[in-house]
Amino acid sequence: MNKEASNNNNSAPDPYYILRGHKFNVNSVLFDKVNPNLLYSGSGDGELKLWNIEEKKCISTQIAHSEGIGGGVLSLQWLSNDNNNENNNNNDEICGNILSQGRDGVIKIWSIIDNCTFKNTYRLETNSLSLGKCSSLSSNLLSISGSAIDPTSSTSQVEIWDLKNKQVINKLKPNNQQLFEKLGLPMSLKLYYENENNDNSNQSNDQIRLCTGYENGELLIWDLRNTSIPLVSSKLHNEPILSFALSNNSTKGISGSGDTNIIEFNINYESKQFNITKTHKLNNGGISEIKIRNDEKIYATAGWDKRIRIFNFKKQTPLAILKYHTESVYSIDFNSNNILASGSKDCKIALWDIYTTKK
């Protein structure tokens, strides 16, 4: 029997607080990128909540999406609050904007008013009914799986939407029919600028890339200037790639799937491949989400086996296995103070203070 390696498991901390209030599984947690004390969460019944983790209470609740089969909140994304100010007819103090993705294919944008109230400022109906989470870039572009209501639609296709004009401006699918057929559904997506270190305001759409994890276990990088041939591609897993994360400079990353491997890799544009640098073997398969902390010293994974795993990103070594949740962990996120939040099928959100520097 394979025994999963980890360091200091016996001393792994408990969460310092549990946020209760959701009645259905918590599918997504997201920290505010301006105020680290604000946390957003979305659940399977379509409920969107705003929490103040310093005061340890929920300060706003909104029904964001329909509930039931095919309903609920699938993911939450942070947006800059520039473009949506044009919809602010009441001169409200907008503290930020978040995007919510429903399982029914509906995309909504919510302005946060006075750090305590949700205001729906945008609605977009797409054809996507897949289980893959969308990826937003600034407040202009959105990538989403193009497979959906029409069973004859192209299952491997990814659509790039202009959020402002509510139009599909690009469709990504390989020209090679054999590759197209074997990829299967896009399961995980990330839009990013070719050079993340540049000021985003100076970037053009021609410099945008999309990394996509597919149902057959392959990871591909696309250049939006030429969407017929991927820039980089490799088969990393034997199961669908459910989550991956890239470093700030997009030169390395981590991927997880339905199998029992967490894979760390470098991106080699010359060989057009992902070079595997480390494989972490797990006792139980299934990784829902991966997040790299802002300082890139550690990363965390959310597991189907109720566990949160912490790794040293630079040394590629396991640090701890966090145990609290009684059901699968679906989502995790770090705030700028390095607090970790985890959302689970058990309807609870756990807050963890781990590997942080005390002042």
Curated annotation (Swiss-Prot):
InterPro entries: G-protein_beta_WD-40_rep, WD40/YVTN_repeat-like_dom_sf, WD40_repeat_CS, WD40_repeat_dom_sf, WD40_rpt. WD repeats lie at residues 21-61, 68-120, 132-171, 192-232, 236-275, 282-321, 324-359. Keywords: Repeat, WD repeat. It comes from the Eukaryota. This is Guanine nucleotide-binding protein subunit beta-like protein 1 homolog.
